[in-house]
Amino acid sequence: MALYCGDNFVYSQPAAAPGAPPTSRAPYGLSDYAAPPAAAANPYLWLNGPGVGGPASAASYLGAPPPPPGAAPGPFLQPPAAPGTFAGAQRGFAQPSASAPASPAGSAAPGELGWLSMASREDLMKMVRPPYSYSALIAMAIQSAPERKLTLSHIYQFVADNFPFYQRSKAGWQNSIRHNLSLNDCFKKVPRDEDDPGKGNYWTLDPNCEKMFDNGNFRRKRRRRAEASSNLTVPSGTSKSEGQSSRLRVSGKLEGDSPSSILRPSQSPEPPEGTKSTASSPGASTLTSTPCLNTFLSTFNTLNVNSSSSMGNQRTLPGSRRHLGGTQLPSSTFPNTSVPDSSPDSMQLSTVGGSNQLSSYYNPFSGGSSGDQSSPFSSPFYNFSMVNSLIYPRDGSDI
């Protein structure tokens, strides 16, 4: 007894009688392997079309294959089993049911696929949204015109005719078309000529933006980094005196050549004579535009006046060793030097009020030799943390 697979798992085939001779299976003829008709050679399953509509093609694609010539059945197409066995009858894959309506091709088409029926390719396109933005649709419509300009109504017509998806719910996408025409800089409005009948302005595409529409996709140009950084750089037409005045913003530069030059002020080049004679110099404009530097200089001027009134004309740095918090510093760090009244390092600065005033740009913080302990400048280590806070304020403002 042979077992075969069917719809209900397994069914049996009754064995032949022991004495009966084995039946020979008739070979298939060439007509059984003939090619399907031309109507059934369509590779695309556009249903209800000529490829599946005919009875022969329907039988070959959807029904059971033709039985072999002869009385003996094929190995996988067995007759229904006898009642009482554990198997049921084998059925075709796409046999029409009794309640199904008759197909338009007739009763000879047993395998009509009604669950996949679609009217045409246009119905499928109505369900799928085109992969283009509204700006790309407008650009395609304008580029398809002979004069490269269209009115708003003609743009609507182009989109609806070429893309069936937009034939429904026109109010939504037409509003988006109007917004893109108004907000996108690539679309320019061209007024209608006086002799041109009709109403409404024309819309055209900016020639500089034609390369932004690559294969229907709108690609906005990104702003280059060089263009963005050029807006933040200083113009190249600034004078040399302004560049020199910007260098005067930092004072008291430490020089590491020798230990004796730690507190030596930075020597800045003197401005030209033409700049001195003018009432408003680039340095004055720099001081006016930097309030932090003005506060720094005015504080030093006040300290200079107080120190000169309390100490007189004695501006000497002691050479003896000082102890500060248990730390001993060598005497070579602060050499015994004398600073004249008119120091060459002092420079002429104009104040915010516009009055020219000679003020010392640097204060050596010298202590009195008479040993006056009441003076706030009696020690050369005078509160350098306060000076640092003046030069580099803690509020985060830039000098």
Swiss-Prot record:
Pfam families xrefs: Forkhead
Keyword terms, alphabetized: Developmental protein, DNA-binding, Nucleus, Phosphoprotein, Transcription, Transcription regulation
Gene3D superfamilies tied to this protein: Winged helix-like DNA-binding domain superfamily/Winged helix DNA-binding domain (1.10.10.10)
Gene Ontology biological process terms in this record: epidermal cell fate specification; hair follicle development; odontogenesis of dentin-containing tooth; otic placode development; parathyroid gland development; pharyngeal system development; thymus development
Induction: Regulated by ectodysplasin (EDA) in skin appendage placodes.
GO MF, one example: DNA-binding transcription factor activity, RNA polymerase II-specific
Compartment annotation: Nucleus
Phosphoserine modifications at: S99, S103, S258, S266, S268
Segments carrying motif Nuclear localization signal: 219-225
Disordered, as annotated region: 87-109, 221-287, 307-353
Post-translational events: Phosphorylation promotes the transcription factor activity. Dephosphorylation by protein phosphatase 2A (PP2A) reduces its activity.
SMART domains from the UniProt entry: FH
Listed result of changing S258A: Does not affect transcription factor activity
DNA-binding region as annotated in the record: 129-223
Disruption phenotype: Embryonic lethality due to impaired pharyngeal arches segmentation. Embryos fail to form endodermal pouches and this results in failed pharyngeal arches segmentation leading to severe defects in the skull, jaw, and ears. Craniofacial neural crest cells undergo apoptosis in the mutant embryos at 10.0 day post coitum (dpc). Conditional deletion in epithelium leads to fusion of molars with abnormally patterned shallow cusps.
Compositionally biased tracts (Polar residues): 228-248, 258-267, 275-287, 307-317, 328-353
Predominant localisation class: nucleus
Database matches in SUPFAM superfamilies: Winged helix' DNA-binding domain
Function: Transcription factor required for pharyngeal arch development, which is involved in hair, ear, jaw and dental development. May act as a pioneer transcription factor during pharyngeal arch development. Required for epithelial cell differentiation within the epidermis. Acts at multiple stages of otic placode induction: necessary for preplacodal ectoderm to execute an inner ear program. Required for hair follicle stem cell specification. Acts downstream of TBX1 for the formation of the thymus and parathyroid glands from the third pharyngeal pouch.
Name of the featured protein: Forkhead box protein I3
Organism in which the protein naturally occurs: Mus musculus (Mouse)
Lineage, uppermost ranks: Eukaryota, Metazoa, Chordata, Craniata, Vertebrata
